């Protein structure tokens, strides 16, 4: 999909709407407010809808003729979950990309190295995971979050939220923005079986599957590893393999 046209249109429309508001608010206030409101909606939609490509390309699947999926695991590394998840991945002969947080990678270097040593991939999920504010960061802070994260060809924004400064920053670094096809909502749901069932219901060949690690509670210290185990069992029973896709 060509994304440069909607990007330029949205920014151009926002500028025109601001000028229209300035010149028309006194004579046609409702019309001026309506145009300004529409311009804000056009900016917010690709910002807050994770897989929307209007600001630039978002990888949401990969091409394959086989029953293969790309498993991605966000928010690690974690000293408890990462070793357990690596053991589960090995048992199911599955590969995964771990989108790690830079500060956690620096805090847990052994777990980060264990991911790589097991043949999995490490990707950038910002330095601090500012999920509530990243989408409104200016260019300098976005660049800082990317640069202090791990070196990788792939980047995933916190909660998938991104503004129009993200793609230029990634392009300058030769990186791609990765979204997802299906997620298990494992930071919301409380039942690992429900997480696995949701993924299996929506998965298709070439899907990007999103799971998490590191969100531990006293009642469910192994919740995310359990989600991974049940998800891999369900995918295996459905004859899916978890692979690392090549470059696009």
Enumerate the predicted regions with their spans:
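A structural signal for short, hydrophobic/glycine-enriched beta-strand patches
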Residues: 126-128, 139, 158
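N-terminal pre-catalytic segment of deacetylase/amide-hydrolase enzymes
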Residues: 1-71, 79-91, 230-248
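An active-site-proximal "capping" alpha-helix that borders the catalytic cofactor pocket
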Residues: 139-152
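Active-site beta->alpha N-cap acidic-glycine motif
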Residues: 43-134, 168, 172, 185, ...
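His/Asp/Glu-enriched short active-site or ligand-binding loop at hydrolase and phosphoryl-transfer sites
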Residues: 161, 166-202, 240-248
């Amino acid at each position: 999909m060509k994304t440069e046209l909607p990007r330029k249109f949205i920014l151009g429309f926002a500028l025109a709407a601001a000028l229209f508001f300035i010149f028309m608010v006194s004579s046609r206030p409702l019309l001026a407010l309506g145009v300004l409101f529409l311009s804000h909606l056009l900016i917010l939609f690709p910002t807050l809808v994770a897989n929307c490509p209007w600001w630039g390309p978002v990888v949401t699947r990969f091409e394959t003729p086989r029953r293969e999926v790309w498993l991605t695991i966000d928010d690690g590394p974690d000293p408890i979950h990462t070793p357990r998840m690596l053991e589960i991945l090995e048992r199911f002969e599955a590969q995964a990309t771990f989108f790690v947080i830079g500060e956690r990678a620096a805090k847990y270097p052994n777990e980060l190295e264990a991911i790589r040593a097991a043949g999995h991939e490490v990707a950038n999920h910002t330095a601090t995971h500012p999920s509530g504010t990243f989408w409104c960061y200016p260019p300098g802070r976005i660049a800082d979050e990317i640069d202090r994260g791990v070196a990788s060809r792939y980047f995933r924004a916190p909660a998938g939220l991104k503004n129009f400064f993200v793609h230029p920053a990634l392009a300058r670094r030769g990186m791609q923005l990765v979204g997802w096809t299906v997620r298990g909502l494992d930071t919301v749901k409380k039942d690992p079986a429900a997480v696995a069932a949701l993924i299996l219901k929506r998965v298709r060949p070439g899907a990007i599957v999103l799971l998490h690690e590191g969100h531990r509670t006293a009642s469910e210290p192994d919740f995310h590893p359990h989600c991974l185990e049940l998800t891999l069992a369900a995918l295996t029973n459905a004859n899916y393999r978890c692979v690392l896709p090549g470059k696009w």
